[in-house]
Amino acid sequence: MPKYRSAITTHGRNMAGARALWRATGMTDADFGKPIIAVVNSFTQFVPGHVHLRDLGKLVAEQIEAAGGVAKEFNTIAVDDGIAMGHGGMLYSLPSRELIADSVEYMVNAHCADAMVCISNCDKITPGMLMASLRLNIPVIFVSGGPMEAGKTKLSDQIIKLDLVDAMIQGADPKVSDSQSDQVERSACPTCGSCSGMFTANSMNCLTEALGLSQPGNGSLLATHADRKQLFLNAGKRIVELTKRYYEQDDESALPRNIASKAAFENAMTLDIAMGGSTNTVLHLLAAAQEAEIDFTMSDIDKLSRKVPQLCKVAPSTQKYHMEDVHRAGGVIGILGELDRAGLLNRDVKNVLGLTLPQTLEQYDIIVTQDDAVKNMFRAGPAGIRTTQAFSQDCRWDTLDDDRSNGCIRSLEHAYSKDGGLAVLYGNFAENGCIVKTAGVDDSILKFTGPAKVYESQDDAVEAILGGKVVAGDVVVIRYEGPKGGPGMQEMLYPTSFLKSMGLGKACALITDGRFSGGTSGLSIGHVSPEAASGGSIGLIEDGDLIAIDIPNRGIQLQVSDAELAARREAQEARGDKAWTPKNRERQVSFALRAYASLATSADKGAVRDKSKLGG
């Protein structure tokens, strides 16, 4: 029978000092036999997805204490990728994931907490907390802040839905008037919550639900809706039950590594492909799997991508649907229900509620459930009122979207595409693979060949795009922006958005060893591995080289002879200490980022730290 981890700080005369300090936090004699549960919050006023979380830790804590636990809250950092985008701040985004994971480990292990409730929401916070949870392997429940309502405005006598990406594209489009750009900017992000499309934050919160580590509805229920409060209340109660099951009944099924098993990872990736999630999710699932000591690789993702259809299409892949529409159609469980009926899921998995997948679908899939309360929860909709307050409205859709022929979520028979929303490509400069969000690629450019325009920084590429130096038919290559080369593997949302602003969204491709925002769409291929800074062949591409992209056949090829590539590699190696570094880039980075770069692996490994360099 495992002992409560916290007992080492609360029992025994030699722990009098620790107990004295616990008493100073408000604990009493009656608390010293109870489980101590960390409430891992991520409130910050910098990030709209986290601005409403200040009081939500208290909600969870009250339920923990009412159920017989002791709650202790702390905060992690949270970087807003949208605000950090397009300048040096983006260098810090991905490294913040490791910092979050480490800080959770530090706090939880330093104070010997027995379990956790993780209150996350945005891009690197959910992955960082997920990595920490699987590393620590103590009972955990995730409950996120929830999605933002979609922006809405009237343009050309028509009400359209908007998000952050629309504001970026219109702001850079010289054909758009100042007044229209201002109108879109003011309408794009109307409430608290994670950006309203299937960008990285919402994708990861959906995947956490599919992994079984959060409750049904967590991935799609709006941040502003009153129904979301119940998820926080339930999390506080349930974590005490899970904790006691493990420590008092020796039930290891309560542990995250047993819930988020390899079968669950496969289900989560299947969901990701079916819903056309952010390409960043590949990076984060690979990283989380390593923390869980699960053998889940790019090869597994490639195999799944070849058999899973696209059953859901959401912004940025379409302007018609946002997360509020996914929720109305049944949310994550709605998509999982269709995948299950198609025979594409592992059914022998459980979630934090203790329900198997069939039990979860029976209770929460709007197509089959008889539970009116569940149907009512999925009718929770937007209010259209600007606010930074959680749970501030209780509007509901008149009806559910259960149309699996033409609705937001489709059945296998009516899939948006027989090919899924993500694909892994391989070729002579992506030997370990690269990722494309096929959900956002127009059918006309699934096969594309063009001359390379090579840039060794995102900034140079942006300048060239906006300066008219990139023309229809070009393949923009941005390299030395990988985990090590950036460092930090910047997102390329500005270059892809500016291609659209210049009318080149369907006329050019963009390839990088960096990554893309979940808001990116178009022929945007990222995570090229190995990256240039690790000696990857993307570092050998020259201006004018033809690059052939073949998404249907999962190929990407630099049309240069092996002999020529060998000669270029020899010339690169001859640069000595300067080999595999940018020739024409001046970028000063901090010691913290250099430390990150010294241990960073390429994207095919999840951009995690190289344990072999530390003897592990």
Swiss-Prot record:
Residues where N6-carboxylysine is found: K124
Binding site for [2Fe-2S] cluster: C122, C195
GO (cellular component) term, any one: cytosol
Details of cofactor binding: Binds 1 [2Fe-2S] cluster per subunit. This cluster acts as a Lewis acid cofactor.
Cross-referenced PROSITE patterns: ILVD_EDD_1, ILVD_EDD_2
CC cofactor: [2Fe-2S] cluster; Mg(2+)
Catalytic activity from the UniProt record: (2R)-2,3-dihydroxy-3-methylbutanoate = 3-methyl-2-oxobutanoate + H2O; (2R,3R)-2,3-dihydroxy-3-methylpentanoate = (S)-3-methyl-2-oxopentanoate + H2O
InterPro entries, A to Z: Dihydro-acid_dehy_C (IPR042096), DihydroxyA_deHydtase (IPR004404), DiOHA_6PGluconate_deHydtase_CS (IPR020558), ILV_EDD_C (IPR056740), ILV_EDD_N (IPR000581), IlvD/EDD_N (IPR037237)
Pathway assignment: Amino-acid biosynthesis; L-isoleucine biosynthesis; L-isoleucine from 2-oxobutanoate: step 3/4; Amino-acid biosynthesis; L-valine biosynthesis; L-valine from pyruvate: step 3/4
Keywords, in A-Z order: 2Fe-2S, Amino-acid biosynthesis, Branched-chain amino acid biosynthesis, Iron, Iron-sulfur, Lyase, Magnesium, Metal-binding
Positions annotated as active site in the UniProt record: S517 (proton acceptor)
Broad class of enzyme this protein falls into: lyase
Gene Ontology biological process terms from the UniProt entry: isoleucine biosynthetic process; L-valine biosynthetic process
Binding-site list for Mg(2+): D81, D123, K124, E491
Function statement: Functions in the biosynthesis of branched-chain amino acids. Catalyzes the dehydration of (2R,3R)-2,3-dihydroxy-3-methylpentanoate (2,3-dihydroxy-3-methylvalerate) into 2-oxo-3-methylpentanoate (2-oxo-3-methylvalerate) and of (2R)-2,3-dihydroxy-3-methylbutanoate (2,3-dihydroxyisovalerate) into 2-oxo-3-methylbutanoate (2-oxoisovalerate), the penultimate precursor to L-isoleucine and L-valine, respectively.
Subunit structure: Homodimer.
Protein name according to UniProt: Dihydroxy-acid dehydratase
Organism: Escherichia coli O45:K1 (strain S88 / ExPEC)
Gene that specifies this protein: ilvD
